[in-house]
Design a protein with these regions (language model features):
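Basic/Trp-rich segment in TM-proximal cytosolic loops or flexible interdomain/linker regions
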Residues: 1-13, 17, 239, 244-246, ...
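Acidic donor-binding segment of Leloir-type glycosyltransferases
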Residues: 77-142
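Cell-envelope/extracellular polymer assembly enzymes that use nucleotide-activated donors
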Residues: 57-60, 88, 263, 278
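N-terminal membrane-anchoring/stem segments of glycan-assembly enzymes
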Residues: 1-55, 238
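Long helical/loop segments within the catalytic core of UDP-sugar-dependent glycosyltransferases
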Residues: 113-140, 145-154, 158, 162, ...
Length: 337
């Protein structure tokens, strides 16, 4: 009996040793490759500053919102002040129980419009549409029946006027030059179908007009630990996966997509918890099955700031949703693994 227990413990010990060696090697390679790529991008960015670039890809920014009346006006103000020339902002109110839509309508002096929305991907029907042309950037609010974040994003895709769209969270803030940065991979390579941005923790960071006024680590220990986690992931692991077109996720907080390819792939899946990851895996599958030359890229200098949970209960809910979404995506698209 004791020999069986000793044998089992030996196997477990060997497994953990192999796992630690493998994971440490992965982290080491991620840091090395990430450092090299960041240095190359820094040199390339210095060169681009001296080159004229007057072309701007037209982009639709889609912001799904549910019960965001407190923060949504500030979010929209920050989006309307981005350093970019050709874009529109679409806020999709997913059946909020508060005054999300009314707050926006009053704050931006919007008026009701009646225009058909072509359902290229399925979504719940709209209740009303408001627009404003008093801003320098076209701004639209769509109120629809509740169907979840993925359904709201599908509505935004259907309503978007431009061939490229960005999805982001209502509580996130894009850095002022983020659109200029995230379009670069698509301008450099016509085969790019999606680009992920760099998501950073905004807790205790002072932002003004899309720029960092004062940066400091969060006072909350849990949020501070997430800063290290995010930087390790976005500045190391994702750069490594980007080298061989292996990115399996673009954060729902900030990602750029080609609308025609997303529509052809079926849009966002409303039945999964991780709609952002499921879409990227689905794009890989769709492009592979249809023998398309494609790549999914990652822009390390296109920055989005987001709030991290500071309570353990909130972090638990977030990570549970992420891991269940990962499991659902892998099961649904296990054929490409």
């Amino acid at each position: 009996m004791y020999q069986l227990i000793d044998g089992f413990l030996d196997v477990v010990g060997i497994f953990f040793i192999v796992y630690l060696i493998g994971y440490s090697t992965f982290l080491f390679l991620s840091v090395v490759v990430g450092s090299i790529q960041l240095y190359r991008q820094h040199r390339q960015r210095r060169l681009q500053n001296y080159l004229p670039n007057d072309y701007h890809m037209p982009i639709s920014i889609i912001v799904p919102a549910w019960n965001e009346a407190v923060t949504v006006v500030a979010t929209v103000h920050s989006l309307l002040d981005l350093e970019y020339q050709a874009y529109e902002v679409i806020v999709v109110d997913d059946g909020s129980e508060d005054d999300t839509s009314q707050t926006l309508i009053e704050a931006f002096n919007m008026h009701a419009v009646h225009r058909p929305i072509w359902r290229q991907v399925p979504c719940q029907p709209e209740e009303f549409i408001y627009e404003t042309r008093t801003q320098k950037v076209p701004f639209t609010v769509i109120r629809k029946k509740n169907g979840g974040k993925a359904d709201a994003l599908n509505m935004g895709i259907n309503a978007a006027n431009f061939p490229y769209f960005i999805c982001m969270d209502a509580d996130s803030v894009l850095q002022a030059d983020s659109l200029k940065k995230i379009v670069q991979p698509m301008l450099e390579d016509r085969h790019v179908v999606a680009v992920g941005g760099l998501v950073r923790i905004a807790n205790d960071v002072e932002l003004e007009h899309g720029r960092v006024k004062k940066y400091r680590l969060p006072r909350n220990l849990l949020a501070c630990m997430q800063v290290l986690e995010y930087d390790r992931s976005f500045l190391a692991s994702r750069i490594l996966f980007d080298q061989f077109n292996g990115s399996l996720i673009i954060s729902g907080a900030f990602g750029l997509f080609r609308k025609d390819v997303v529509i052809a792939a079926g849009g966002y899946n409303v039945s999964t918890l991780g709609e952002d990851m499921e879409l990227v895996v689905k794009l890989h599958e769709y492009c592979t099955v249809n023998r398309m030359d494609y790549c999914i890229r990652y822009a390390t200098d296109a920055i989005c700031w987001t709030q991290a949970p500071e309570r353990l209960s909130d972090l638990k809910k977030q990570r549970r949703r992420w891991h269940l979404g990962l499991f659902q995506s892998m099961m649904k698209h296990r054929g490409i693994l």
